[in-house]
Amino acid sequence: MALSCQSVAQTLTDVIARRPVLKPVLRPFEDLLAARSALAGELTAAWTNSAAAGGSCPPEWQTERAARGLSLLTGAPLTGLCISVRTAAERLLPLLCAQESLASQSTALEDFFLAPPVLGPDSKPDRRDALARAMLSGDAPAFRNLADEAGLAPELLEFAAEFILSPPLRALAARAVQAGQVEREGPNSAPWDEEGAWRQGYCPVCGSFPVIGWLDKPFFEEKNAFLSGGGGKKHLYCSLCGTNWKFRRGTCPSCGKDGNGVMEILRESGAARGERVDWCTSCKTYCPTLDLRENDAI
């Protein structure tokens, strides 16, 4: 079943129409989000073009690694990713530094992200490649060291890095999906969508935790009624690399616990339009979730 998406501008307009109180929070990020989306689309189109030779290549999806809970990019060298990261920084840093919280750190951010790539065999590893490895592996000490060397607060570098690394990582994820489709000769699916292939609450590509989940709508397959379904399957979404994956409805994505009473569903009183928060009674984390069966606008 093919998926479609709308523009950043239209998405924000729809959200603000439903939640006017969010306008001053969302509008300042509109240009930045739109630029990130556009660049991710450009890199994805270039890297997944079979006639193109450029772009980084993701590792091959391995069922054995996935069974051990290892995301696709965990431990990947990522050498040379710095080139596309610099391209992303050239486009996104001016918009990032227009934000009040980052304006005073623009020089340090430019020095870090816009330096010429370091790719020689005898050269020290490029800091942008090291940054990507630290973020994808969850290596907090390495990340703090990079922030200290750059003269940036770790939380500030993380905020900027999540925007700047996102377009190249989304292109890598799309290339991994394409490789899986060629291998399995099936469209509109990824290797981690195979039944039981990925059972973790974190992203199968980059290892980040989801920012949102959703329950899908009922669907009808015209060519084969046996493939139709009542909907309600749960999916999670990673904002860093743009990956979606299936997940068990009664399980916490953060701590992995399941069973009766583990996950509580919190809704606002009145017409919630399928919007809710799935809250874990065990680890006290939560995931915003949208039940598309209850939302006719989507």
Model-identified regions with their sequence ranges:
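N-terminal alpha-helical interaction blocks
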Residues: C5-A190
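Cys/His-clustered metal-coordination modules, chiefly Zn-binding fingers
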Residues: F163, P167, A174-I298
